[in-house]
From Swiss-Prot:
Gene3D superfamilies hit by this protein: Phosphorylase Kinase, domain 1, Ribonuclease Inhibitor, Transferase(Phosphotransferase) domain 1
Name the record gives this protein: Probable inactive receptor kinase At3g02880
Predominant subcellular localization, coarse grouping: membrane
Modification Phosphoserine occurs at: 347, 424, 519, 621, 626
Region (Disordered): 222-246
Lineage, uppermost ranks: Eukaryota, Viridiplantae, Streptophyta, Embryophyta, Tracheophyta
Organism: Arabidopsis thaliana
Modified residues (Phosphothreonine): 444, 595
Domain of life of the organism encoding this protein: Eukaryota
Subcellular location(s) of the protein: Membrane
Keywords noted in UniProt: ATP-binding, Leucine-rich repeat, Membrane, Nucleotide-binding, Phosphoprotein, Receptor, Repeat, Signal, Transmembrane, Transmembrane helix
Amino acid sequence: MKYKRKLSLSVVFLFVFYLAAVTSDLESDRRALLAVRNSVRGRPLLWNMSASSPCNWHGVHCDAGRVTALRLPGSGLFGSLPIGGIGNLTQLKTLSLRFNSLSGPIPSDFSNLVLLRYLYLQGNAFSGEIPSLLFTLPSIIRINLGENKFSGRIPDNVNSATRLVTLYLERNQLSGPIPEITLPLQQFNVSSNQLNGSIPSSLSSWPRTAFEGNTLCGKPLDTCEAESPNGGDAGGPNTPPEKKDSDKLSAGAIVGIVIGCVVGLLLLLLILFCLCRKRKKEENVPSRNVEAPVAAATSSAAIPKETVVVVPPAKATGSESGAVNKDLTFFVKSFGEFDLDGLLKASAEVLGKGTVGSSYKASFEHGLVVAVKRLRDVVVPEKEFRERLHVLGSMSHANLVTLIAYYFSRDEKLLVFEYMSKGSLSAILHGNKGNGRTPLNWETRAGIALGAARAISYLHSRDGTTSHGNIKSSNILLSDSYEAKVSDYGLAPIISSTSAPNRIDGYRAPEITDARKISQKADVYSFGVLILELLTGKSPTHQQLNEEGVDLPRWVQSVTEQQTPSDVLDPELTRYQPEGNENIIRLLKIGMSCTAQFPDSRPSMAEVTRLIEEVSHSSGSPNPVSD
């Protein structure tokens, strides 16, 4: 009996001791978070200090009575992390402080985070050297320190992190060589630093974009100067001397050289004669200024602005039988009077190169400005081309870019549109990230989504088969007041399928096999991706879209299931948004519904437009830019 009583007392004692230990550990976590709060400022850190448990605080996640995750992305945090703060959260597995304004070094007591798996600190202003202790953490899987101010060398002990699959160090101030890294990494980027030297052979299989913006050499970049493609220096000091007999030329060799020179001279004269005849013919054709196509610019770089004057195109023919046609066919003349010669002589500026052709800004002397699209790979005959263009020219909507005129010949197909001064939504979302850039606020983004939805809904209302065919952010153009207008509508059927965009661009619906045959439900999918891009700030074509290599819709779905919808939003959007983002989440869910895997599960564009109108109206009237 006494034995049973002693056993019961022991069990009770152990249980009480366990509760006390758990309470003590949670209190230790609470003190650590308060230390962070005292050093770091930001809206989410207005935690309820009266609560005994930190597990209900914003961004804090607990498991078994301990803090296991701290997620405060894009929360406007600033200041430096203290010793005795995060480093004392010894059960922490996930730390996400990305896209804030935190500065200073990474605290040395991060070495205590032996269970840490995921470290996301990108998009801050952390400085100092990258501590080597990060690569001694036994559980670490992903490290993202991109877009900070880290300096010094990449630690030599990277290979100590045996479970590491992601290492992002781009856009810092790192210097020196890249150490040999033999880990089976799945994601890697050190671009836009001050690194130098040869790229280790273990990293040579990564794309150029992982290393650009440094002074590195070796695969996949240019060959290092010390390396010789032939394996040695030709004609170097170790080259054996030739025999003396080779210094003397035989009579046969001399005769061969003379004959070769004579033949070469005759060929040169023949070429000069042909060039002179061609030049005389071209002098009879009026000189024209024509823009030369340029390579497509990336979404993260500014498109170069330059005027290029080249040899005029071949003589324009108005039909495939060869009849001359120098006339533009106009749909709208309210933009101003001009003819083909005037258009080709106008001051031209390269805007970019897309999937259907190159675009230029044409400025006339009298002040008129238009946009010209030079189509490429047109595969339909003239009659079908003209019929198609007349259908497009008859369309009129406030959110469609106006098709002013077109020109058709065997060698040239030109479309003339109204010019949109603010450029494309893609350039604004993913272009210059400098201090002078003004980000789009919520009201403006909602207005852009609504304008684009109305335009596409109008296209679909023409009949049951009319679709846009190429919806993406670079085809959403903006006016001075940030009014959205949709461009490149209805052109997919007349362009070669090899030129039409494919699924790699991130907007294409999964059921599409022929890029020239896009259904209205496929348009809805592409528009859904556009909404997600507008709210997350992530390009669907970005290589580092997320850390699993999935497309944008699946990434949004995955994050919202594991965390909260707010975790996927563009930090530039949440930073300037007042408390409460219910309408943002509503629009995000509309975008997700549009990207349903099966076409029948997607709403119609009319329904999408109605839903966005409700969101927009409950948000108030749009303002163009953030305060």
